[in-house]
Design a protein with these regions (language model features):
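N-terminal polyanion-binding entry modules of DNA glycosylases/AP lyases
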Residues: 1-105, 109, 167-195
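Catalytic DNA-binding helix-loop module of base-excision-repair DNA glycosylases/AP lyases
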Residues: 34, 106-152, 178
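A short linear-motif detector with a strong N-terminal bias
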Residues: 43-44, 64, 117, 158-162
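C-terminal end-helix/capping segment
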Residues: 59, 142-170
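Helix N-cap/coil-helix junction residues
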Residues: 77, 97, 119-120, 156
Length: 195
């Protein structure tokens, strides 16, 4: 990581996040859910189609619950993701989840609260911690782009498993988010990171 950091003296760790649409925690959760198994570009296009259904804005939880699931499917959202979006919207609408409360939770509590939602796993919750809450010690070991960046940075002859990424990232504590940002940036701008 030292060479990657030294090679980028003017690096802005938030620049890659700034390339994403502006979003609060709820928006980041929608982005992460819609973006499961998709590229950032495909996620953006799908979100744009969703916004077109709601007069150009992301739907509130109440709007999402009132929406015809078929229209969301036509916008490119899979049935499984529609179920996840609806479960999240129900929990936010009935008070089982509250974005203000979630924002104040520790990372572990946040992860536990969100992964209780059907269809939200660690990658989705970790992404929201990183993108919306900008927590300092988050890594997304399940993210394929990050795994490829770690492979390149550490000159591995194989794509590291999620467990290998977690083990490698232990060295980055308590600034795993910063290291993740360097690696994502290198992956997105096409440079070859070195450790």
């Amino acid at each position: 990581m030292a060479r990657l950091i030294d090679a980028r003296p003017d690096f802005d760790p938030h620049a890659w996040i700034a390339q994403l649409p502006p979003m609060d925690l709820y928006g980041a959760l929608l982005f992460q859910i819609v973006g499961q198994q998709l590229s950032v570009a495909a996620t953006r296009r799908t979100l744009e189609r969703i916004q077109a259904l709601f007069a150009g804005h992301l739907p509130s939880p109440a709007e999402l619950l009132a929406a015809d699931p078929g229209s969301l499917r036509q916008a490119g959202v899979s049935w499984r993701k529609i179920g996840t979006l609806r479960d999240l919207a129900e929990r936010l609408s009935d008070g089982r989840l509250d974005v203000d409360v979630l924002s104040g939770l520790s990372d572990e509590e946040f992860m536990a609260a969100l992964t209780a939602v059907s269809g939200i796993g660690p990658w989705t919750a970790q992404g929201a911690l990183l993108i919306a809450l900008q927590r300092e010690d988050v890594v997304l070991p399940g993210d394929l782009a990050l795994r490829k960046a770690v492979q390149s940075a550490y000159q591995l002859d194989h794509l590291p498993s999620q467990q290998e990424v977690v083990a490698i990232a232990e060295k980055w504590r308590p600034y795993r988010s910063l290291a993740t940002s360097y690696l994502f940036s290198a992956a997105f701008d096409g440079t070859s990171p070195s450790p």
